[in-house]
């Protein structure tokens, strides 16, 4: 249950607070010179490296804009690569529980906390990251906001569609999935792989390179935008790039209590610089990076595209799973049918 401590969790969080406090004293992960302290400072934590496109091209410029518009009264200090401690699946709860001020992460890392968001990962929800991001915000207040208790969503955007990247066995037809161990980023996308006959393996993106290289997994389900950021073209040989698979949503969320305690003028700076507009910048970066990944893979890797008939076979294989997910949500008291209908997933 969101926000409820499990046995032994208090000690873990206490230790983590100690680790983070030490990290804050020693880490110089900020876009501002040491000594240029503002009246308010927000610490944003993530698993991505500082070279990641969203970190470098969206969040860093945003933090600079916040400092400029607030005239130095508010700064956002960026901590990449899990510098404040913990593991990637813990990022959202770190922020939700006030251990950090904000985070950039995936809802899919803790799918049980985001039952409505999980439905947006199903196949057929969008035609591009831009399209998917607009749909996320169009459905946010009515369907998705309930997943974000204790936080304020600053950014929410879609990735490009997932691809299948494999080292030794290409995926050209539905039958090729049988028995393949494929990395998945979330429970929602695990269900897609099971529907196709594969064996899903939960794994954060930071473990894909070594796992694929050593044969721990046969393939990874991941967008082409990640191929360059995480150097996956070095280890994968086959890329099925136009499969009708789902898309991972990403988010930047802030602790709600921390936001509410900001002065009104600084809340306005946050409000004016985030939301759909900033989210669409993230989507644009993913769409552009996806094409860059495809172009890079073309040089000495095999790109696989599916016929319209084969794509339809996959979509038919997904329908029972989509219907089951919708019914499970309804039984749990969630407006799952309304969201599935809003996306037109069952026709």
Sequence positions of predicted segments:
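A gly/proline- and charged-residue-enriched helix-loop-helix capping module
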Residues: 132-141
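Secretory targeting signals
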Residues: 1-14
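N-terminal secretory/targeting leader peptides
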Residues: 13-14, 18-130, 143-347
């Amino acid at each position: 249950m969101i926000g409820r401590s499990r046995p032994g969790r208090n000690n873990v969080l206490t230790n983590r607070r100690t680790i983070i406090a030490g990290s804050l004293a020693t880490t110089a992960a900020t876009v501002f010179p040491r000594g240029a302290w503002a009246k308010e400072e927000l610490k944003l934590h993530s698993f991505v490296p500082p070279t990641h496109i969203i970190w470098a091209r969206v969040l860093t410029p945003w933090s600079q804009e916040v400092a400029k518009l607030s005239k130095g009264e508010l700064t956002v200090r960026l901590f990449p690569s899990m510098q404040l401690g913990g593991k990637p699946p813990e990022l959202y709860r770190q922020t939700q529980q006030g251990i950090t001020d904000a985070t950039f992460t995936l809802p899919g890392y803790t799918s049980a906390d985001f039952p409505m968001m999980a439905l947006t990962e199903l196949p057929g929800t969008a035609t591009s990251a831009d399209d998917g991001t607009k749909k996320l915000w169009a459905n946010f207040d009515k369907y998705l906001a309930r997943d974000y208790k204790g936080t304020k969503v600053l950014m929410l955007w879609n990735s490009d569609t997932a691809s299948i990247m494999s080292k030794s066995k290409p995926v050209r037809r539905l039958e090729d999935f049988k028995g393949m161990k494929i990395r998945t980023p979330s429970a929602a996308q695990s269900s897609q792989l099971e529907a196709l006959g594969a064996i899903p393996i939960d794994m954060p993106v930071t473990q894909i390179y070594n796992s694929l290289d050593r044969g721990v997994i046969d393939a990874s389900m991941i967008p082409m935008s990640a191929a360059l950021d995480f150097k996956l073209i070095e280890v994968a040989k086959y890329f099925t790039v136009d499969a009708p698979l789902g898309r991972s949503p990403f988010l930047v969320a802030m602790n709600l209590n921390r936001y509410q305690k900001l002065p009104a003028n600084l809340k306005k700076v946050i409000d004016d610089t985030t939301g759909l507009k900033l989210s669409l910048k993230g989507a644009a970066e993913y769409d552009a990076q996806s094409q860059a990944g495809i172009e890079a893979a073309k040089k000495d890797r095999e790109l696989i595209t599916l016929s319209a008939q084969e794509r339809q076979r996959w979509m038919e294989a997904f329908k029972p799973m989509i219907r089951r997910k919708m019914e499970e949500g309804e039984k749990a008291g969630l407006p799952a049918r309304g969201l599935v209908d809003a996306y037109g997933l069952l026709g």
